[in-house]
Amino acid sequence: SKWTDKHEVIQGSRFDYDGGPFYWQYDFIVPLGIPNPIAPAAFGPAGYRVMDTLCFEGGLFNRRVVTEIGLPDPRFFIYWDDTMYGYRASKVTNPIVVPDVILRRTREIGNWDIAGVRQLNSTSDMNRYHIMRNRGYMARYFMTYGDFRPLVFGLGTVLTAAKEVIRLVMVDREHLKTGLVQIAKGWWDSRKLMHDPTWKPMPSLK
C-alpha cells in the first residue's frame, strides 16, 4: 500500500459511534507521561502525522519492529499498554497515524462534551485503578530509555489524577466514592512498581 512501503508502524483512523470523526490523541508528551489533548487533528501536507504512541485497535506493525522491541507488556493488563508499545516502537522507527478510516465505534459511551472540541468519556473503576497503577510501569520504561524526569513525571501523575477526579464528577458521579478509592489505590501501587527491584522490561525477540 502507499503507507506500508515506507512506514513500519501505521495507525488507521476511525469514526465515532455517531459517524463523525473520532479524535485520537496521537501526540504523547513523554516527560509528563500524558497524551497531548490539543494536538492538531488535521494531517497536514504530508497526509499523515508522526506519533510516539499507539492504539492496538487498528495498529499495524512491521515484523522487524516487533522483533527489535519485543512483545507488548502483559503486566499492564489494561490501559497505557498500547501507549507504551507505541513509545517503544518510536525508539526504532517513526510510527504514523493516517486518515484512512478502518474502524467505527458502535457503542455509545457516556461523556462530557468539552466546548464541542474534546470529549471526556465514562470509564470503570477497574480502568481508573489501572490508569494510575500502570504509571509505575510507564516510569520504568522511561527509566530504561533515559526519558524519566522525576519531578515532571510527578506533575503528569497529578494531572492524570485530577483528570480522573473531573471524569468522576462530570461523567461518573454515581461511582464517586468507589472511584476515588481506586484512584488512590492505583497511585499507591504505582509507587511500589517504580521501586520494584525485580522489574525488567520486555526483552527483544532478536
Predicted regions and their residues:
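Conserved donor NDP-sugar-binding/catalytic core segment of glycosyltransferases
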Residues: S1-D27
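A recurrent flexible, glycine/aromatic-enriched loop bordering the glycosyltransferase active site
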Residues: P40-F61, Q119-S122
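A short, conserved alpha-helix in the catalytic core of glycosyltransferases
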Residues: G59-G70, R75-V101
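A structural signal for well-ordered alpha-helical segments within the folded catalytic domains
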Residues: T83-M84, M126-R133, V181, K185
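Active-site donor/metal-binding and catalytic loop motifs
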Residues: V98-Q119
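A short acidic, glycine-rich active-site loop
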Residues: V117-Y129
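A conserved mid-domain beta-alpha-beta active-site/ligand-binding segment of alpha/beta enzyme cores
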Residues: I131-Y141
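Non-catalytic, C-terminal membrane-associated alpha-helical segments of glycosyltransferases
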Residues: M143-K206
